[in-house]
Amino acid sequence: MELKERNFKKIGLICVAVLLCGMVFSYGIFPSILRFMIKQNVLLKPGTQIRDMFEKIPFPLDFKLHIFNVTNPDEIMRGGKPRVNDIGPLYFEEWKEKYDTVDNVEEDTLTFTLRNTWIFRPDLSALTGEEIVTIPHPLIMGVLLMVQRDREAMMPLVKKGVNILFDPLESAFLKVRIMDLLFDGIYVDCSSQDFAAKALCSGMDSEGAVMPHNETHYKFSFFGMRNHTEAGRWVVYRGVKNIRDLGRVVSYNEETEMDIWDGDECNQYIGTDSTIFPPFLTAQDRLWAWSPEICRSLGAHYVHKSKYAGLPMSYFELDFGDLKNEPHNHCFCRDAPDDCPPKGTMDLSPCLGGPIIGSKPHFYGADPKLVEAVDGLAPNKAAHDVYIHFELASICWFTGSPVSAAKRLQFSMELGPIRDHELFGQLPDVILPMFWAEEGASLNKTWTNQLKYQLFLGLKFNATVKWLTIIIGTVGAVGSAYMYFRKETKTTDVAPVDVSTPDTNPSSAKDGVVNVSLGRNLPPVIDGLDKPPKLRATELQQERY
C-alpha cells in the first residue's frame, strides 16, 4: 500500500513537470526562437534573401487599367447627366526595381532609386489598346478649371493660349486611341510664338504635365512619362536597430517631409513604400504605406480572419474615410470643414496639379450622390474594394510583403462650367470618372509553400506540443492526486439482534450483542449494565409493610 502511494506521488510530480515544461517551451522558448529567426530573415541587410527580393521583386505585379468611355459628350456640353461605360481591363506586367543602393550602418538606412516598368500583355487583356475612347480633355479642362479656381486673374491669358494650342477648340472632351492616352502620348504643338501659347506650354512643362518630344512639340500621357524612368530617390530604415521601423520611409528626393498640404501632420511620410512591412504587427495596427503618386499615406485596418492557399491569414481593408468629420485630416481639405472632398474621396489637385479626385473604383464606399450623378456606375465590393491578406505572426517572414493584395484607385475630373466661356459655360458640376487602376499580386504555390513549410509547420508543431503537454500533464496530475489521496473504506456486515420476550433467558440476548465499531462480540454481562430482577407481588407487598 505504501509503495503504491509513493508511485502515484512520483507520477503526479512527473506530469506536473511535463505540463510546466510544455508551457515554458510553447509560450517562452519557441516564440523567442521564432522571433529571432524572423528578425534574421526580414532585415534589409546586404546579402540576405529579403534584401535581394526588396531590390528586385522576382515576379511582376499585376497592373490592370479600366477606361470610362463617355457615351454622351454632346449632351454633357449642354448640361446633361453624364453616361459612361467601364471598358477593360488592359493588363500590364509591372516590374519594380531598386538600384544605386547605399547602406548607412550608423543611421540604419538604405538609400535607393526606384524604377517602374510596365509591359503590355495583349494575351491577358480584354482590349487591344487600339480602341477609340472619349474622356474629359485632361489638358484643356485641367488648365481652365485650375486657373479659374486658384488664379482667376490669369483666365484671359490662359483662354487665349488654349485657343491657340488646341485649335480648333470644339469640345471639352477628347477622342483618343487608348494606348496614346496611356503610354504612347498625345502631341501638343507648342511651335507658336504667341506669348500666351508659349507661357501655357512653359507652365505645363514645369508642372510635369507634358514631356518634351522635340524642340516644338510635347507629349502628354497618363503613364508614358513614368515608364522605365526614375521614380524618385528613397531612404528607408533597414530594421536592424529597430525591427518595427523596417521599411519605413525616412525621406523622398532628399526631403524628410512633403510641402503639399496645409498642415504638418498631412505632410509626414507614414509607413513603407508598400512592398514591405515590419513583422509582429497585431490586429490593432494599421498597415501604413506612402505613395508619391497621390502625395499621402494611407492605412489599411484589420477586418477579420481569412484564408489564402489554405493558410490562415488576416484580412485588411482600406477606407478613405470622411475628411469633413475627421479633424485630424482637415489639412487635406481646401478650406475645412466647409470645403472638403465628399466622403470616400481625396482631393489630389495639390499633388497632381489638376482638378483630380481620387476614390475607389465606381465610387465604392463613397457618398451615394456621386454614383447617382453619373449613369453607368455599379459599385461592387469584390471588384472595387482595396484589400490585403497578411500573416500577422510575421507578415510573411520570408518576404516581408503581403501574400495577396489589390490596390485599386479611380481618377476622376472635378468638372464644372467655365465662366464667361461660350463653349464650356453650360458644363454640369459633377465628378466625372476617367479611369481606374488596379495594382496587385497573389503569391503562387512556389512562395506559399515556403511560407507553409518554413513557418506554419513550426507553428503547428508548437501547437501540438503545447496541447499534448497540457492534456497529458493535467490529466496525469489530477489522476495521480486522486489516487494518492483516496482511502479504502472497508465495511463489515452487521448481524441482526434478536429481541427477547420476558420469558426468554436474558443471557441469550446478551450473547447476541455485537460491537459494531470493533466487529467483536461483547461479554455477556457488563458491570453496571444488568437490569435488576423483577420482584414478585408477595415480595412487593411485604416490602411495603
Curated annotation (Swiss-Prot):
<dbReference type="GO" id="GO:0016020">
    <property type="term" value="C:membrane"/>
</dbReference>
<dbReference type="InterPro" id="IPR002159">
    <property type="entry name" value="CD36_fam"/>
</dbReference>
<keyword id="KW-0812">Transmembrane</keyword>
<comment type="function">
    <text>Plays an olfactory role that is not restricted to pheromone sensitivity.</text>
</comment>
<feature type="transmembrane region" description="Helical">
    <location>
        <begin position="465"/>
        <end position="485"/>
    </location>
</feature>
<feature type="topological domain" description="Cytoplasmic">
    <location>
        <begin position="486"/>
        <end position="545"/>
    </location>
</feature>
<keyword id="KW-0675">Receptor</keyword>
<feature type="disulfide bond">
    <location>
        <begin position="295"/>
        <end position="351"/>
    </location>
</feature>
<feature type="glycosylation site" description="N-linked (GlcNAc...) asparagine">
    <location>
        <position position="214"/>
    </location>
</feature>
<dbReference type="GO" id="GO:0007608">
    <property type="term" value="P:sensory perception of smell"/>
</dbReference>
<keyword id="KW-0472">Membrane</keyword>
<dbReference type="Pfam" id="PF01130">
    <property type="entry name" value="CD36"/>
</dbReference>
<feature type="glycosylation site" description="N-linked (GlcNAc...) asparagine">
    <location>
        <position position="227"/>
    </location>
</feature>
<keyword id="KW-1003">Cell membrane</keyword>
<feature type="glycosylation site" description="N-linked (GlcNAc...) asparagine">
    <location>
        <position position="444"/>
    </location>
</feature>
<feature type="glycosylation site" description="N-linked (GlcNAc...) asparagine">
    <location>
        <position position="69"/>
    </location>
</feature>
<feature type="disulfide bond">
    <location>
        <begin position="333"/>
        <end position="340"/>
    </location>
</feature>
<keyword id="KW-1015">Disulfide bond</keyword>
<protein>
    <recommendedName>
        <fullName>Sensory neuron membrane protein 1</fullName>
    </recommendedName>
</protein>
<keyword id="KW-0325">Glycoprotein</keyword>
<feature type="transmembrane region" description="Helical">
    <location>
        <begin position="11"/>
        <end position="31"/>
    </location>
</feature>
<keyword id="KW-0716">Sensory transduction</keyword>
<feature type="glycosylation site" description="N-linked (GlcNAc...) asparagine">
    <location>
        <position position="462"/>
    </location>
</feature>
<feature type="topological domain" description="Cytoplasmic">
    <location>
        <begin position="1"/>
        <end position="10"/>
    </location>
</feature>
<feature type="disulfide bond">
    <location>
        <begin position="266"/>
        <end position="331"/>
    </location>
</feature>
<dbReference type="GO" id="GO:0005886">
    <property type="term" value="C:plasma membrane"/>
</dbReference>
<dbReference type="GO" id="GO:0005044">
    <property type="term" value="F:scavenger receptor activity"/>
</dbReference>
<feature type="topological domain" description="Extracellular">
    <location>
        <begin position="32"/>
        <end position="464"/>
    </location>
</feature>
<keyword id="KW-0552">Olfaction</keyword>
<keyword id="KW-1133">Transmembrane helix</keyword>
<comment type="similarity">
    <text>Belongs to the CD36 family.</text>
</comment>
